[in-house]
């Protein structure tokens, strides 16, 4: 009986294994490689070198004759203001409320030049102004541009008056407004208007 099981098992194995025989596939054909000649790059046609474009000119600032523009207003203020001779005056940097760039430093210098040796006011020097701005933590280039800042700075400098100026309207021909203010109260004691001259 053991023999018949062995024979039956062997026969069974032979049948199973005979069913697993697969078709043999042909190996993929091997193609011999041909040496490839290196491809020469196609020369690109020379591109024209772009010509430099002219640099556009920045818009020119309109030249305003600040001395001629501010002198009549300053003369009017000195005649009209009833102040004690020798009173200390802080000239605030002109505020630009025009529609463009304004030469604010030149305008402020023209106001200061017109006020020099007028007999009524002693001007705060630029050194004193820079020192006071530093003490208050303001940038040396800070244009105060507000009456409250200007009055606060004037109090720090022991000035009695502040001249607050504004340029308004078209930058080519701005309207100038000046206001002389009493530092102690902030009261405007004189105000004048004029048109800048080219």
Curated annotation (Swiss-Prot):
Entry GO MF terms: enzyme regulator activity
Return the Low complexity bias intervals.
Answer: 26-37
Entry-linked InterPro entries: LpoB
Residue positions bearing lipid (S-diacylglycerol cysteine): 20
Pfam families the record matches: LpoB (PF13036)
Principal subcellular localization = membrane
Q: Which residues carry the N-palmitoyl cysteine lipidation?
A: 20
Localization terms from the record:
Cell outer membrane
Membrane topology, as annotated, equals: Lipid-anchor
> Is Transport one of the keywords UniProt gives this record?
no
Biased-composition ranges, Pro residues, are 38-59
Q: One GO CC annotation, please?
A: periplasmic side of cell outer membrane
User: Which key words tag this protein in UniProt?
Assistant: Cell outer membrane, Cell shape, Lipoprotein, Membrane, Palmitate, Peptidoglycan synthesis, Signal
For region Disordered, the annotated ranges are 26-59
**Superkingdom of source:** Bacteria
Q: Some GO term, biological process aspect, for this entry: which one?
A: regulation of cell shape
**Signal peptide: which range, if any?**
1-19
Which ranges form a coiled coil?
A: none
Q: Which NCBIfam families match?
A: lp
Q: What does this protein do?
A: Regulator of peptidoglycan synthesis that is essential for the function of penicillin-binding protein 1B (PBP1b).
Q: What is its quaternary makeup?
A: Interacts with PBP1b.
Similarity-based family: Belongs to the LpoB family.
Q: What protein am I looking at?
A: Penicillin-binding protein activator LpoB
Organism for this UniProt entry = Pantoea ananatis (strain LMG 20103)
Q: Which gene encodes it?
A: lpoB
